[in-house]
Amino acid sequence: MTEPNRAQAPAQNKAAADTPAVDENKIIAERREKLAALRQQGVAFPNDFRPTHQAAALQAQYADTEQATLEAAPVEVAIAGRMMLKRVMGKASFATVQDGSGQIQFYITRDKVGEEVYAAFKHWDLGDIISARGELFRTNKGELSVQVRELRLLSKSLRPLPDKFHGLADQEMKYRQRYVDLIVSPETRNTFRARTDAISSLRRHMADAGFMEVETPMLHPIPGGAAAKPFITHHNALDMQMFLRIAPELYLKRLIVGGFERVFEINRNFRNEGVSPRHNPEFTMMEFYAAYTDYRWLMDFTEDLIRKAAIDARGSAVLTYQDRELDLSKPFHRLTICQAIQKFAPQYTDAQLADAEFLRTELKKFGVNTNAPQFLNAGLGTLQLVLFEETAESQLWEPTFIVDYPVEVSPLARASDTVPGITERFELFITGREIANGFSELNDAEDQADRFRKQVEQKDAGDEEAMYFDADYIRALEYGMPPTGGCGIGIDRLVMLLTDSPNIRDVILFPHLRKED
């Protein structure tokens, strides 16, 4: 911070490493005493101040305004925020105040605010929420500041903030106490602003393309729409077991049957599975369905959506992710599963990739248990897919659509008319992570019923992620569903890319954590 013409600011505080350890309990006790005194005065938590300006807007609007202009045409402001820095110097003081948009400096003098208020201000603490009315001026070093005329304490902070040099050093504490992380870390605030910008971009472009946003149930009588283990709960009024949804797909396709030809939903999915840097049991997806389209149309549309989201959220389609360039402006690659394997593991021949027994033997070298329930009836396509996951998936840095998924792992996708055993399905990978999954939808009710039966057989054999038989969805298909394409985009993983975040918990405001001790 810089000082105004009338005063000389003191030197900056020393680094936290030079600061003696503080007794947090003692600080909290002292602040509670201050709050008790405020309560006695009847002014502990006033709620009659209304800001007229925000810090960032003022900084932008008056960035080039000189002091002479501000003196000639005074700008009255009313602004409030959290006190992040305080420097008391006799009859004049500085305070850096942070609101929801940014920071601005207050210049507070005893002559302007009065002796009583100034004396009280000296006892206010970092973290307190304060308000000011006054005029803008520029310090002799050019910093835009507020010459405070009226100063108030709006909310007393009882807990000390982390030191400004290190913030929250413990990563888990950042997730657990996100409210503190947001206070002290502009990077965290920018991450979640970018998340909002990306989601707003998706919504805007979906509306421009004629899609209607809808809301479908979060509690399902039958889990469906994905291969995943659900969370289970109980509906007391109906006395029935319910499942938190693992995907909205089957309900959205019911709407296609009903005549809404373009629908989408952005909402939570829940999967009772593991936690990792790219998996959270509660996550956000956007799923969309368009009648009279297929998976080729979906790939073009999805590519355009993601490119626009990057531009809207970050200002460019060329990003840096984990110190590597990520160019979303170029056309996305398209490879079959076998083409991707041979690109990154060229030692495999066409003949080997067509040999199921060879693939089973090869997968064991990667530690894959091919005797697990999901492999009991695995065909060639499934074995190829698992080999792809072991050899190629993590190396797909540039945006790449992987196509031609086998029918046996795609129970809701339309089968290819030209290649037996293959579906019109894709998955989009960027930086080695799956970002989207889409396909031409299966609209043959009899074929869908048969695939559900096979899924039930797999579940009975021990595959917990196999799908249930959804008789009502089959009934809906029997009324006739037009040719349709559908896709799901993982919002959290997309935001990871756009914000250079290595862990999915970095882009979820309140991620799941183990119970606090």
Swiss-Prot record:
<dbReference type="InterPro" id="IPR002313">
    <property type="entry name" value="Lys-tRNA-ligase_II"/>
</dbReference>
<dbReference type="InterPro" id="IPR044136">
    <property type="entry name" value="Lys-tRNA-ligase_II_N"/>
</dbReference>
<comment type="subunit">
    <text>Homodimer.</text>
</comment>
<keyword id="KW-0648">Protein biosynthesis</keyword>
<dbReference type="InterPro" id="IPR004364">
    <property type="entry name" value="Aa-tRNA-synt_II"/>
</dbReference>
<keyword id="KW-0479">Metal-binding</keyword>
<dbReference type="InterPro" id="IPR018149">
    <property type="entry name" value="Lys-tRNA-synth_II_C"/>
</dbReference>
<dbReference type="Pfam" id="PF00152">
    <property type="entry name" value="tRNA-synt_2"/>
</dbReference>
<keyword id="KW-0547">Nucleotide-binding</keyword>
<feature type="binding site">
    <location>
        <position position="434"/>
    </location>
    <ligand>
        <name>Mg(2+) 2</name>
    </ligand>
</feature>
<feature type="binding site">
    <location>
        <position position="427"/>
    </location>
    <ligand>
        <name>Mg(2+) 1</name>
    </ligand>
</feature>
<dbReference type="Pfam" id="PF01336">
    <property type="entry name" value="tRNA_anti-codon"/>
</dbReference>
<keyword id="KW-0963">Cytoplasm</keyword>
<keyword id="KW-0030">Aminoacyl-tRNA synthetase</keyword>
<dbReference type="GO" id="GO:0005524">
    <property type="term" value="F:ATP binding"/>
</dbReference>
<dbReference type="InterPro" id="IPR045864">
    <property type="entry name" value="aa-tRNA-synth_II/BPL/LPL"/>
</dbReference>
<keyword id="KW-0436">Ligase</keyword>
<dbReference type="InterPro" id="IPR004365">
    <property type="entry name" value="NA-bd_OB_tRNA"/>
</dbReference>
<dbReference type="GO" id="GO:0000287">
    <property type="term" value="F:magnesium ion binding"/>
</dbReference>
<dbReference type="GO" id="GO:0000049">
    <property type="term" value="F:tRNA binding"/>
</dbReference>
<feature type="region of interest" description="Disordered">
    <location>
        <begin position="1"/>
        <end position="21"/>
    </location>
</feature>
<protein>
    <recommendedName>
        <fullName>Lysine--tRNA ligase</fullName>
        <ecNumber>6.1.1.6</ecNumber>
    </recommendedName>
</protein>
<feature type="binding site">
    <location>
        <position position="434"/>
    </location>
    <ligand>
        <name>Mg(2+) 1</name>
    </ligand>
</feature>
<keyword id="KW-0460">Magnesium</keyword>
<dbReference type="GO" id="GO:0006430">
    <property type="term" value="P:lysyl-tRNA aminoacylation"/>
</dbReference>
<dbReference type="InterPro" id="IPR006195">
    <property type="entry name" value="aa-tRNA-synth_II"/>
</dbReference>
<feature type="compositionally biased region" description="Low complexity">
    <location>
        <begin position="7"/>
        <end position="20"/>
    </location>
</feature>
<keyword id="KW-0067">ATP-binding</keyword>
<dbReference type="GO" id="GO:0005829">
    <property type="term" value="C:cytosol"/>
</dbReference>
<dbReference type="InterPro" id="IPR012340">
    <property type="entry name" value="NA-bd_OB-fold"/>
</dbReference>
<comment type="similarity">
    <text>Belongs to the class-II aminoacyl-tRNA synthetase family.</text>
</comment>
<dbReference type="GO" id="GO:0004824">
    <property type="term" value="F:lysine-tRNA ligase activity"/>
</dbReference>
